[in-house]
Each structure stands twice: as C-alpha cells, then as structure tokens.
C-alpha cells in the first residue's frame, strides 16, 4: 500500500484494510508506505513496494502526486509485477495518455467521467464541457455540476415555499434536506445524517489504451448501488466496515458494463 500521510490517505488506508479484513480475511498486508503530501519523488517507496512479491498494491494518491508515482513506477515494471488499484485516479487519465499502464483498476470517488452511466443529461454535460475545455470532464467537474444542480433544486423549492420571495438561509437548508435530484453521474440522495449528507452510486473499471481514439478507455466497469457502499442511517463508516457491511443493500440491477465505456 502507498497512501499520503494526512487525513485522506490515512482514512483511505484504514477503510481499505477494514474492508479487506471482511472480504478477503486470508489476505495479509505487506509493505505499507505513507509518504508526506506533495512528496513528488517516490523512488524509495517504489523500491520498498517491489521488494516483496505481492498480488495487489492499493493507493489513494491523487493529482500531481499520483501522476508522479505512475510515471516513476511504470518504467520499473511495478504495474506488470502486481495488480495496482488506484481509488481516485480517473482525473489523471487525460493527462497521462498512453503512459497510463493498461489493466490498472481505478475509481473516481463516484460514477464519474468514463464511468458515468449513460443518460441524456450526461450526454449533454459531456459534450458541453468537452467543447468548452477541449477535454472530457472527470470527477471534480462532475461534483461541481451535481452540487450546482442540487443548489438550483433547493432554491426553486425554497422560493416556492416562501411564495416567490427571497428565502432565508433556514428555508434554503430545509429545502435541500432529504431531497433527491438527477445529475450527470446518476441520482444524488441526501439520505444520511438526517438528510444532510449525500450518497450516490459508484463504479470501478480497468484501464486500456485505445490507439484509434488516442485515449485511455475503461473496460470491465463494475457498478455499485449507493446503499451498497455507504453505511445505513446513524451508523459510522468505521463501525459499519468492522461489522462486515451490516445492512448493505447491494442490488444486482446496478449492473456491469460488458464493453468499454465510450
């Protein structure tokens, strides 16, 4: 494992280990690296990770740190020696291009970018963003778009509740609490923390360079319902993981893509 030594990396490491303890109790952790945020150079960590034969390497690195790690480790054969899982990597695909190793399992902290479910709304969003910025949208633009759509819904509901007059902050908050709305990444539900925390479906996939399109595509996309990957109401995430995902509702209707996402 290699995760950054601050809250995000530490929490990601903990959640991964708790999940593995339930899903694959026979698996044993080996090398565990926690470089500082923004380290940039990972030669020592890569040597440590490759010093032992392991089936899987997990990482929650992101942004420039993730790009640097991939560019430094791929030439040394790390991605061929072990299955690498990058939980938040979709945003580096456009920049890395064919330098992104094939067969890497990646996530996007949601069903974003190449893993977004097909819908007229997503098609409109994808085309509009791509035309404006000359690159397709990844997780951050998707999150901003769905947040603005949620805000639009709350404002409209609050205005109606306040008879067309400018609503107070309290009325705005009440309008958003417990609501649901469509987004390019699928349905967003304010389902946890008394209707004040959103959940949504998520997905993972495997990278594959497409020479004809000159871009990284995703194969074997696996989809998971929001209620399958989030704890039930009033249960802390860590307690839920320790319980073996008690109360998880995993509907097979979420489906798996048999072909690369286009």
Please place each PLM-identified region on the residue numbering.
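Extracellular/periplasmic periplasmic-binding protein-like sensory domains
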Residues: 72-146, 156-163, 217-253
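Extracellular/periplasmic Venus flytrap/periplasmic-binding protein
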Residues: 1-75, 115-120, 124
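Surface-exposed patches in mature extracellular/periplasmic domains of secreted proteins
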Residues: 1-4, 136-143, 161-169, 189-190
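A structural signal for well-ordered alpha-helical segments within the folded catalytic domains
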Residues: 67, 142-152, 170, 198-199
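Residue-level signal for nonpolar/aromatic packing positions in well-ordered secondary structure
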Residues: 16, 57, 69, 104, ...
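Short, well-structured alpha-helical segments that form the helix of a local strand-helix-strand
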Residues: 165-185
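Sec-exported extracytoplasmic/periplasmic mature domains
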Residues: 17-25, 50-54, 71-78, 130-134, ...
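Solvent-exposed, acidic/polar segments of extracytosolic/periplasmic ligand-binding ectodomains
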Residues: 180-262
